[in-house]
């Protein structure tokens, strides 16, 4: 009986020692797991909980575990103990200037003490998640809507200075060259006006749609130009027209029209000369009438103003030509000449009582000027018609392309190969 009790006590002692060894071995594993997953304060709490758990297990084994208990049951009880999850680290980070700011919840570090959010921009409002850009002078953030810069210009900004920094002289905002396509906000490629070949083609397609020139004519013009500079210079230099028109390009009706125009131009030039002589003749008659009136007033002792109209102003063209020939002796009529007074043709009636010749000087002056003006207008019309017809004759010597009118190029500008491509 005593032997049996001793064996039982030894078995219980051995069983307890094995449990303690098993717990010691598992304690290291669990402790390592908590060290890797928890912070320093959480590790201390986990060790305390683990020590208490081991003591409770040992007491439970000593008090309640019978000889049928196994190590597997105790192991499952220890493994099922709850673990403490670790807290994710929280850090604040503010990105550099000219970067897109994301969601406010992920970008702003809310203060745990007063829960105040930082204020930005000239509007002094917090980050609401809209697009902002940073100033390279004061390194503050500004809403794009507050400084009138759209978000699409983000990639075009080289450096940005807010209005205050610009006013203080810290710098000015600089930009990259924008693609010429209106709806594109990308920067251009080096040595180009476009961000891509596609946008270059799209840009000129829009230009062609707005042009009044037919697309086929533009194609011919492109074929004519070998380089971009040549295409840009089209139309800046006109074609070289021949000085003489070859007879083979002149039509018969144009010959008749040219003869008629030449005859009319000759006649109008003669009328122009006559009108000019009439104005000179009027001035000479005024001088002659003044001398005749003065002589008459001295002879008659009259102090009142007299009419002084000279009826020689009413001469027909033939009579005027004879008088001019007599005055000028065959030379062109000029104001340096003079006409002898003629008392027989001069009116010596009191000026205010002569209703027949009222304002005769003004009337004849305006009449002769109007005659000359009408003749000059007719002469210009005839000369313009002659020049247009001659221009058409010269243009028929040149190759032409029809496009809302005619674009013409001289032979010297085109090689035979280009001429063939141009006239296809």
From Swiss-Prot:
The gene is spp1
| Main location class | nucleus
Q: Where would I find the PHD-type zinc fingers in this protein? A: 118-168
- SUPFAM superfamilies referenced in this protein's UniProt entry, alphabetically: FYVE/PHD zinc finger (SSF57903)
Q: Where in the cell is it found?
A: Nucleus
The identity of this protein, by name, is Set1 complex component spp1
- One GO BP: positive regulation of DNA-templated transcription
- Could you give one GO CC term from the UniProt record? Set1C/COMPASS complex
């Amino acid at each position: 009986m005593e032997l049996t009790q001793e064996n039982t006590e030894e078995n219980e002692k051995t069983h307890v020692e094995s449990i303690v060894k098993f717990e010691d071995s598992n304690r290291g594993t669990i402790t390592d797991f908590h060290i890797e997953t928890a912070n320093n304060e959480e590790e201390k709490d986990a060790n305390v909980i683990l020590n208490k758990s081991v003591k409770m297990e040992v007491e439970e084994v000593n008090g309640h575990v019978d000889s049928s208990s196994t190590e597997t049951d105790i192991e499952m009880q220890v493994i099922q103990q709850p673990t403490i999850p670790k807290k994710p680290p929280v850090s604040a980070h503010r990105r550099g200037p000219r970067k897109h700011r994301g969601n406010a919840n992920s970008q702003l570090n809310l203060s745990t003490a007063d829960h105040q959010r930082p204020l930005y921009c000239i509007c002094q409002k917090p980050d609401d998640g809209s697009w902002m850009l940073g100033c390279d002078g004061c390194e503050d953030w500004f809403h794009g809507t507050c400084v009138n810069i759209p978000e699409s210009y983000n990639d075009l900004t080289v450096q940005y200075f807010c209005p205050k920094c610009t006013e203080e002289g810290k710098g000015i905002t600089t930009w990259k060259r924008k693609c010429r396509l209106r709806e594109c906000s990308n920067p251009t490629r080096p040595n180009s006006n476009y961000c891509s070949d596609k946008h270059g083609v799209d840009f000129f397609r829009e230009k062609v749609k707005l042009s009044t020139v037919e697309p086929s004519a533009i194609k011919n013009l492109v074929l004519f130009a070998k380089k971009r500079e040549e295409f840009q210079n089209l139309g800046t230099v006109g074609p070289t027209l021949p000085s003489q028109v070859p007879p083979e390009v002149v039509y018969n009706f144009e010959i008749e029209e040219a003869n008629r125009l030449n005859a009319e131009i000759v006649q109008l030039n003669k009328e122009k000369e006559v009108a000019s002589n009439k104005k000179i003749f009027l001035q000479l008659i005024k001088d002659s009438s003044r001398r005749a009136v003065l002589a008459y007033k001295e002879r008659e002792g009259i102090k009142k103003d007299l009419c002084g109209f000279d009826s020689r102003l009413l001469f027909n063209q033939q009579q005027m030509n004879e008088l001019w020939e007599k005055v000028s002796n065959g030379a062109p009529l000029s104001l340096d000449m003079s006409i002898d007074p003629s008392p027989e043709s001069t009116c010596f009636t009191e000026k205010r009582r002569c209703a027949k010749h009222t304002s005769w000087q003004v009337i004849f002056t305006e009449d002769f000027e109007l005659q000359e003006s009408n003749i000059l207008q007719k002469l210009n019309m005839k000369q313009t018609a002659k020049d247009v017809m001659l221009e058409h004759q010269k243009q028929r010597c040149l190759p032409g392309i029809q496009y809302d009118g005619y674009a013409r190029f001289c032979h010297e500008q085109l090689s035979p190969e280009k001429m063939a491509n141009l006239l296809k």
